[in-house]
C-alpha cells in the first residue's frame, strides 16, 4: 500500500499544487481498452469473414486456384480457423481489416475534433492544463484507439509474420504507453493530435496494399503509393516532429509550469512528462527507420515497375506471380529429371538396333 501511494505521489506526475481529484481524466478508465481488446478481435474476425471475404472473392484472385469453392464456403472457412492460417487470402484480409479500422478511426477523429481549438493551435494543448474537460466523444475515441492497439498485440499471435515484426511490436507497446500515460495525466489533447495525424497515412498505406492485390485496379498501385508517401512525409516527418514534438519540448513547460526544466539533469519532478517526451522521440525514430524502407521502394518504383508493399507481410513475402513462377519451374525440372534417363535409354537402344541391322546386312550372302 505504501509503495502504491509512493508511485502515485502527485508531484511525480502532475504540475505543482495539483492533486489527482482535480484531473478530469481518471486512471481507472484505462481498464476499458483492455476489456475492449477481445471484442475488437471478435469484430475483426466477423468483419473479415463477411465483408472482407466478399471483397476478396469478387475483386482479387485469392481464391482463383479453388474453382469449386463458393462465397459462403470461403466465409465459413475463414471464420472457423482460416483467420489463423498463412495464405494469400489471409494477408489480404489483414490489410482489409486495418484499412477499414484506420478509415473509421480517422473519420471519427475528424468528427469529434472538428470544432476543437487545439486542432488548429497546438498551444491549446497546454493552456489551462491539466483541467481540460474530456467530452464523451473524445473519451470513446481514446478508449477505442487504445483498445485497438491491445487487439493488435493479441492478433500478432495468429497474424502472418512480417519482416518488421519486432519493430511493429515496439511501435504498439510505445503507442499503448503513450496513450495510457497521456490519459493518466490528462495530456489527452496532444494525444488526439498524434492519433489523428498517424491514422491518415495508415489509411493510404493499407489502401495501397489492397489496390495492389486488386485484380481490377493494378494501374492504381503507383498512384496510391504517391498518396501514401505524400501523407507519410506530411504527417510523420513534418507535422509530428516539427509541430507536436517541438511544441511539447519548447512550449508546454512555459505554459504549464514556467520554472520547470524539461532537460534538467537532476530530474526535478514531475517525471511523467519527461517519459512521455522520450516516448514521442522514440516513436519518431521508428518513423525514420520506416522512411528508409519507403525510400527504397520509391527508388525501385522510379526505375520501373509497380510499387511493392511498403512493409513486407512476411520474411518470404514474394509476389504471388513470382511464387507461382518458381513453383512451375521447380515442377518442370523435377519432371524433366524423371523423364530424361528413360529417354536416354531409348536413344541408346535405338542406336544399338541400327548397328545390329547394319551388321546383319553386311553378313548376309549376296544373291547372284
UniProtKB/Swiss-Prot annotation:
Any one biological process term the GO annotation gives: regulation of locomotion
Basic residues composition-biased segments: 357-368
Catalytic reactions of this protein: a very long-chain fatty acyl-CoA + a sphingoid base = an N-(very-long-chain fatty acyl)-sphingoid base + CoA + H(+); 15-methylhexadecasphinganine + a fatty acyl-CoA = an N-acyl-15-methylhexadecasphinganine + CoA + H(+); a fatty acyl-CoA + sphinganine = an N-acylsphinganine + CoA + H(+); sphinganine + tetradecanoyl-CoA = N-(tetradecanoyl)-sphinganine + CoA + H(+)
SMART domains on file: TLC (SM00724)
Membrane topology of the entry: Multi-pass membrane protein
The TLC domain, residue ranges: 90-303
Main location: membrane
InterPro entries per record: Lag1/Lac1-like (IPR016439), TLC-dom (IPR006634)
A cellular component annotation (GO) from this entry: axon
Lineage top rank: taxon: Eukaryota
GO MF terms, alphabetically ordered: sphingosine N-acyltransferase activity
Pfam families: TRAM_LAG1_CLN8
Sequence segments annotated as region (Disordered): 306-368
Acidic residues composition-biased segments: 343-353
Cysteine-cysteine disulfides: none
Keywords annotated in UniProt: Lipid biosynthesis, Lipid metabolism, Membrane, Sphingolipid metabolism, Transferase, Transmembrane, Transmembrane helix
Transmembrane segments: 27-47, 92-112, 138-158, 165-185, 191-211, 225-245, 275-295
Pathway: Lipid metabolism; sphingolipid metabolism
EC number(s) reported in the record: 2.3.1.297
Locations listed in the record: Membrane
Function: Catalyzes the acylation of sphingoid bases to form ceramides, which are key players in cell signaling events such as extending lifespan and enhancing stress resistance. C.elegans contain specific sphingoid bases, which are unique or different in structure compared to the sphingoid bases found in other animals. Two examples of these distinctive compounds are: 15-methylhexadecasphinganine and 15-methylhexadecasphing-4-enine. Exhibits substrate preference for fatty acyl-coA chains containing carbon chain length (C16-C18) and very long chains (24 carbons and more).
Family of this protein: Belongs to the sphingosine N-acyltransferase family.
Protein name as catalogued: Ceramide synthase hyl-1
Organism per entry: Caenorhabditis elegans
Amino acid at each position: 500500500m505504501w509503495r502504491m501511494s509512493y508511485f502515485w505521489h502527485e508531484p511525480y506526475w502532475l504540475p505543482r499544487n495539483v492533486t489527482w481529484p482535480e484531473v478530469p481524466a481518471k486512471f481507472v478508465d484505462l481498464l476499458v481498452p483492455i476489456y475492449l481488446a477481445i471484442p475488437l478481435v471478435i469484430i475483426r474476425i466477423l468483419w473479415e469473414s463477411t465483408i472482407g471475404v466478399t471483397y476478396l472473392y469478387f475483386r482479387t484472385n485469392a481464391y482463383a486456384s479453388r474453382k469449386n469453392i463458393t462465397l459462403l464456403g470461403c466465409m465459413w472457412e475463414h471464420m472457423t480457423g482460416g483467420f489463423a492460417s498463412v495464405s494469400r487470402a489471409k494477408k489480404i484480409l489483414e490489410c482489409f481489416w486495418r484499412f477499414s479500422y484506420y478509415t473509421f478511426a480517422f473519420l471519427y477523429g475528424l468528427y469529434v475534433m472538428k470544432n476543437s481549438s487545439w486542432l488548429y493551435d497546438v498551444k491549446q494543448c497546454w493552456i489551462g492544463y491539466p483541467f481540460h474537460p474530456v467530452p464523451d466523444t473524445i473519451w470513446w475515441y481514446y478508449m477505442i484507439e487504445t483498445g485497438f492497439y491491445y487487439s493488435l498485440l493479441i492478433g500478432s499471435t495468429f497474424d502472418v509474420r512480417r519482416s518488421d515484426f519486432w519493430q511493429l511490436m515496439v511501435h504498439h507497446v510505445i503507442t499503448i504507453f503513450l496513450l495510457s500515460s497521456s490519459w493518466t495525466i490528462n495530456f489527452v489533447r496532444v494525444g488526439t493530435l498524434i492519433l489523428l495525424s498517424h491514422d491518415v497515412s495508415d489509411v493510404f498505406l493499407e489502401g495501397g496494399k489492397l489496390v495492389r492485390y486488386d485484380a481490377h485496379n493494378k494501374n492504381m498501385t503507383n498512384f496510391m503509393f504517391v498518396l501514401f508517401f505524400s501523407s507519410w512525409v506530411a504527417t510523420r516527418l513534418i507535422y509530428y516532429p516539427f509541430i507536436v514534438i517541438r511544441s511539447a519540448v519548447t512550449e508546454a513547460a512555459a505554459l504549464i509550469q514556467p520554472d520547470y526544466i524539461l532537460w534538467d539533469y537532476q530530474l526535478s519532478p514531475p517525471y511523467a512528462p519527461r517519459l512521455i517526451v522520450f516516448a514521442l522521440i522514440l516513436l519518431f525514430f521508428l518513423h525514420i527507420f520506416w522512411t528508409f524502407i519507403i525510400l527504397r521502394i520509391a527508388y525501385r518504383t522510379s526505375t520501373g515497375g509497380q510499387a511493392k508493399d511498403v512493409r513486407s507481410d512476411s520474411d518470404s513475402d514474394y509476389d504471388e506471380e513470382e511464387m507461382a513462377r518458381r513453383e512451375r519451374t521447380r515442377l518442370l525440372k523435377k519432371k524433366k529429371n524423371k523423364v530424361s534417363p528413360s529417354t536416354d535409354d531409348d536413344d541408346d537402344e535405338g542406336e544399338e538396333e541400327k548397328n545390329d541391322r547394319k551388321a546383319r546386312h553386311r553378313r548376309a550372302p549376296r544373291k547372284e
